[in-house]
């Protein structure tokens, strides 16, 4: 009797195991079959785990590039994720019209607090209607004409940087980690533009309060989660799980909230009309955000916090990454540095305004062709964000060349892969070569349109004009003010956690006037 019962129990267990095995195998076949005709690494057919491992290596951008080199322009990176390497398809995947919503990838980049939940922003929201609601009021603030009303804030920050270098390094001839100081500059610029108040990184010569490290730690945590966003919902954006750990996104929100609440209190006694078209000179961006929120009562109550968070978290490190690449490349390639110096010195000699002002104005340098070429080459070679910008294929699917991509597939392009596309940028696409931008204007415009650094289509980065203002001004000013000696070009190090972080640009500086 006992033997019969044991046999019956074993039969039930066996049947259950067979059923579960059948379900598991069927699921694997279903996952594999959907995109079976798209080449890619073996494990990408069944799981996203290898995508997490790629991010954890800190060199996912190189792995993605190598995968495209092996499998072609269209590669399966995951069971439901396809990467495209040819810039010719940028307008298809990132159109100006609605229809290609962002994937769950972006939810992992939203800061989270137990009290307020996940905070959407213009960059991270997947909701097309919410994106339009958040973007439309602030878009005029990021136009070049409005950004130039804030140029004096950039000049004030440059002045502090120059004063600190003169005081700290000219007499001692101590080396400078230029990478750190460019980060300090970029953050203090955004602090000044946003709050009319620097964070104090330049004055202190360090990451005051650990703010830069906090943002990087947040991104370091979020980057792997972007590859498995379902796990982010369980482990990060979950109030129960959040109670057992410190949220880095919450720390950044506290910084933003402090500045915002102080300004809101101060603004109650002021007359604010909120018009982006009537911005007065030197009025900072937080003032303008608050004014716009007051003028648009239909906006969500957290909109000022979301706009400000984007400035603080994304508007600094991204620009600093390109600054570092431009300076490292110039200092490592003396011939291109000399050509740029010749152009800047000639402009200074022939431009009365450049002679009479301490720092070059945007008007004085915006059209210098070789400066423009160097900035574009830095933007191309080292985009700050280097994982694919994921989108969801709309109903009916799409054709990429002769390859059909079914609806609901995640599709994306990595800025690193796109910007290093050899058929577009030349066989030397991996190398620093500003001359590629000095050819016919038509060719230059075609290549510029192929750069994905700032995104594309209706979700293109709002802060592009601010970045260009900072880049051209800091490169021109520092090169005209100092002579640089790079100590070890090979010490340059890069970490990729969605945002890049670079170290090891050790230099010595001396005033140009000291030698001349």
UniProtKB/Swiss-Prot annotation:
Q: Name one GO biological process term.
A: terpenoid biosynthetic process
Q: Which PANTHER family match?
A: CYTOCHROME P450, CYTOCHROME P450 MONOOXYGENASE PKFB
Q: Which GO molecular function terms does the record list?
A: heme binding; iron ion binding; monooxygenase activity; oxidoreductase activity, acting on paired donors, with incorporation or reduction of molecular oxygen
Q: How does it sit in the membrane?
A: Single-pass membrane protein
Q: What class of enzyme is it?
A: oxidoreductase
Pathway note: Secondary metabolite biosynthesis; terpenoid biosynthesis
Q: What is its EC number?
A: 1.-.-.-
What switches on its expression?
Answer: Expression is significantly up-regulated under xenovulene A producing condition.
**UniProt biotechnology annotation:** Xenovulene A is a natural product exhibiting little structural resemblance with classical benzodiazepines yet is able to displace high-affinity ligand binding to the benzodiazepine site of the gamma-aminobutyrate A (GABAA) receptor and could be potentially used as an anti-depressant with reduced addictive properties.
According to the UniProt record, one GO cellular component term is: membrane
User: What cofactor does this protein call for?
Assistant: heme
Residues that bind heme, according to the entry?
Answer: 461
Q: What does this protein do?
A: Cytochrome P450 monooxygenase; part of the gene cluster that mediates the biosynthesis of xenovulene A, an unusual meroterpenoid that has potent inhibitory effects on the human gamma-aminobutyrate A (GABAA) benzodiazepine receptor. The first step of xenovulene A biosynthesis is the biosynthesis of 3-methylorcinaldehyde performed by the non-reducing polyketide synthase aspks1. The salicylate hydroxylase asL1 then catalyzes the oxidative dearomatization of 3-methylorcinaldehyde to yield a dearomatized hydroxycyclohexadione.
Q: Where are the transmembrane segments?
A: 9-29
Q: What is this protein called?
A: Cytochrome P450 monooxygenase asR2
Q: Does the keyword Repeat apply?
A: no
Record localization: Membrane
Q: Does the keyword Acetylation apply?
A: no
Question: Which keywords belong to this entry?
Answer: Glycoprotein, Heme, Iron, Membrane, Metal-binding, Monooxygenase, Oxidoreductase, Transmembrane, Transmembrane helix
Q: Which residues are glycosylated?
A: 248, 273
**Which family does the record claim for this protein?**
Belongs to the cytochrome P450 family.
State where it is primarily located.
membrane
């Amino acid at each position: 009797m006992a033997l019969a019962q044991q046999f019956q129990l074993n039969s039930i267990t066996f049947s259950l195991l067979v059923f579960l095995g059948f379900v598991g195998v069927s699921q694997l076949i279903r996952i594999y079959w959907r995109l079976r005709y798209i080449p890619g690494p073996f494990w990408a057919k069944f799981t996203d785990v290898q995508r997490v491992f790629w991010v954890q290596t800190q060199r996912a951008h190189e792995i993605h590039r190598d995968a495209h080199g092996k499998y072609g322009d269209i590669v399966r990176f995951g069971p439901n994720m396809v990467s495209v390497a040819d810039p010719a398809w940028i307008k298809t995947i990132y159109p100006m019209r609605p229809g290609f919503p962002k994937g769950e990838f972006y939810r992992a980049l939203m800061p989270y607090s137990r009290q307020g939940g996940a905070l959407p922003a213009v960059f991270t929201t997947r909701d097309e209607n919410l994106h339009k609601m958040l973007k439309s009021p602030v878009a005029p603030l990021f136009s070049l004409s409005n950004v130039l009303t804030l140029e004096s804030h950039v000049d004030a920050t440059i002045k502090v940087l120059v004063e600190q270098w003169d005081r700290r390094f000219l007499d001692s001839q101590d080396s400078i980690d230029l990478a750190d100081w460019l980060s300090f500059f970029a953050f203090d610029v955004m602090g000044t533009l946003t709050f009319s108040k620097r964070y104090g990184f330049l004055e202190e010569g360090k990451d005051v309060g650990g703010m830069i490290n906090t943002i990087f730690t947040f991104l370091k945590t979020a980057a792997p989660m972007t590859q498995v966003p379902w796990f982010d919902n369980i482990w990060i954006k979950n109030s129960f799980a959040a109670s057992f750990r410190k949220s880095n996104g919450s720390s950044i929100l506290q910084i933003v909230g402090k500045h915002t609440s102080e300004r809101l209190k101060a603004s109650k006694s002021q007359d604010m009309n909120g018009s982006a078209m009537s911005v007065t000179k030197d009025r900072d961006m937080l003032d303008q955000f608050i004014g716009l929120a007051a003028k648009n009562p239909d906006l969500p109550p957290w909109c000022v916090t979301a706009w400000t968070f984007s400035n603080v978290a994304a508007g600094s490190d991204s620009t600093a990454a390109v600054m570092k690449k431009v300076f490292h490349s110039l200092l490592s390639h003396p011939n291109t540095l000399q050509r740029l110096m010749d152009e800047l010195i000639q402009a200074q000699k022939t431009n009365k305004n450049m002679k009479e002002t301490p720092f070059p104005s945007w008007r004085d340098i915006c059209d210098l062709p070789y400066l423009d070429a160097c900035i574009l080459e830095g933007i191309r070679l080292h985009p700050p964000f280097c994982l694919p910008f994921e989108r969801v294929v709309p109903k009916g699917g799409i054709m990429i060349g002769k390859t059909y991509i079914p609806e609901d597939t995640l599709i994306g392009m990595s800025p690193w892969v796109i910007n290093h596309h050899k058929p577009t940028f030349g066989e030397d696409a991996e190398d620093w070569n500003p001359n590629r931008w000095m050819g016919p204007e038509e060719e230059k415009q075609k290549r510029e349109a192929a750069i994905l650094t700032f995104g594309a289509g209706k979700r293109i980065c709002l802060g592009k004009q601010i970045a260009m203002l900072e880049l051209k001004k800091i490169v021109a000013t520092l090169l005209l003010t100092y002579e640089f000696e790079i100590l070890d070009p090979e010490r340059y190090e890069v970490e990729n956690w969605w945002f890049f972080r670079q170290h090891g640009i050790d230099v010595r500086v001396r005033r140009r006037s000291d030698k001349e």
